[in-house]
From Swiss-Prot:
Origin species: Shewanella halifaxensis (strain HAW-EB4)
Pfam families in the cross-refs: Semialdhyde_dh, Semialdhyde_dhC_1
Encoding gene (name): argC
Designated name of the protein: N-acetyl-gamma-glutamyl-phosphate reductase
Top-level EC class: oxidoreductase
Compartments reported by the entry: Cytoplasm
GO biological process: L-arginine biosynthetic process
Functional summary from the UniProt entry: Catalyzes the NADPH-dependent reduction of N-acetyl-5-glutamyl phosphate to yield N-acetyl-L-glutamate 5-semialdehyde.
GO molecular function, one term: NAD binding
Active site positions, chain numbering: 155
Reaction catalysed by this enzyme: N-acetyl-L-glutamate 5-semialdehyde + phosphate + NADP(+) = N-acetyl-L-glutamyl 5-phosphate + NADPH + H(+)
Known pathway: Amino-acid biosynthesis; L-arginine biosynthesis; N(2)-acetyl-L-ornithine from L-glutamate: step 3/4
Signal peptide extent: none
Length: 330
């Protein structure tokens, strides 16, 4: 039985992974934690999320004593916290010998020079960063199994990379174009005007400047044009990706490339059929659909995931299971 501490449990992602871990027969929740100044400290998780009434745990403030208790009693820590918070907590728990699964972006880039530009801080833990593994579960399982510092990918990069990595060897110098729409939960639980019921609409944001663009490019090995959009629905991501493939590429070549997912039970690939968000909401699955025009050489791929599940919590759980050698296919 692996004992897992969850820090940042009051947010959408933290609550989601709390529910997932609570349902695992080989795992237990060591504790649910929030910051010392959180207005939610002391509340039951079910007070914030009645759907989780079966989880009889309260949100504990993360004091120094609480951190020492985690080190003494937990096998792993999940960080569902802001990048600037995870930066320090991840390094501290890692240095204490715990496995760390960080859902923020604080350890996704191996290059320290990326952090001031994209996250607004200077990374001061170069050795921990050097040990960090990018937790794209279907692609980096051997590294996830052996590292104790796992940077769980962002939601948009997960949807995009699962779609693009199988055909990366077929790409030309023309940049892939990724247009992706996310549900409002992707913006977090904190009240904001642009995510309020009367204001939310379908709109692009972070145009030519979203931090997930370099994350996708780094892991793909090629620059991309990425435009995220906020949709007027709660959860889910649909990414539509257009790429030009090398001259002479055939539909059979693409079909063969996607056979890398034949044994990946959480990924479904279909030719000339396209997914919708409702197909994957509340699941750990990724649905891909693709169509290829041999005359122009253009391939269009659609990738659908639940942003809180495969785009965050359930992928973190996959990484935990890979690390502790448990079954991941449910």
């Amino acid at each position: 039985m692996k004992n897992i501490a969850i820090i940042g449990a009051s947010g959408y992602t933290g609550a989601q992974i709390s529910s997932l871990i609570n349902a695992e027969s080989t795992m237990s929740i060591q504790g649910l934690y929030v910051s010392e100044n959180s207005l939610d400290k002391g509340k039951a998780l079910s007070d914030l999320y009645p759907a989780y009434s079966h989880i009889d745990l309260c949100l504990t403030p993360l004091t120094d004593d609480a951190k020492q208790t985690i080190v003494a009693t937990a096998d792993a820590v999940v960080l569902a916290t802001d990048h600037g918070v995870s930066l320090h907590l991840a390094a501290w728990f890692y240095q204490q010998g715990l496995a760390v699964f960080d859902l923020s972006g604080a350890y996704r880039f191996s290059d320290v020079a990326q952090y001031p530009k994209w996250y607004g801080f200077t990374h001061e833990y170069s050795q921990v960063l050097a040990d960090a593994v990018y937790g794209l579960a279907e692609w980096n399982a051997p590294q996830i199994a052996t590292s104790k510092m796992i940077a769980v990918p962002g939601c948009y990069p997960t949807a995009s990379l699962i779609a693009l990595k199988p055909v990366a060897h077929l790409l030309t110098d023309i940049l892939p174009v990724i247009n992706a729409v996310s549900g409002v939960t992707g913006a977090g639980r904190k009240a904001q005007l642009h995510t309020s019921f009367c204001e939310v609409s379908l709109t692009p944001y972070g145009v030519l400047g979203h931090r997930h663009q370099p994350e996708i490019a780094t892991q793909l090995g090629q620059e991309v044009i990425f435009t995220p959009h906020l949709g007027n629905f709660k959860r889910g991501i649909l990414a539509t990706i257009t790429v030009q493939l090398a001259a002479g590429t055939t539909a059979s070549d693409i079909e063969k490339a996607y056979q890398c997912y034949d044994s990946a039970e959480l990924i479904t690939v279909k030719q000339n059929q396209f997914p919708k968000v409702d197909d994957v909401v509340q699941t750990a699955n990724c649905h891909l659909g693709w169509k290829f025009d041999e005359q122009s050489g253009y391939l269009v791929i659609a990738s659908a995931i639940d942003n809180l599940m495969k785009g965050a919590a359930s992928q973190a759980l996959q990484c935990i299971k890979i690390h502790f050698n448990a079954s991941v296919n449910h």
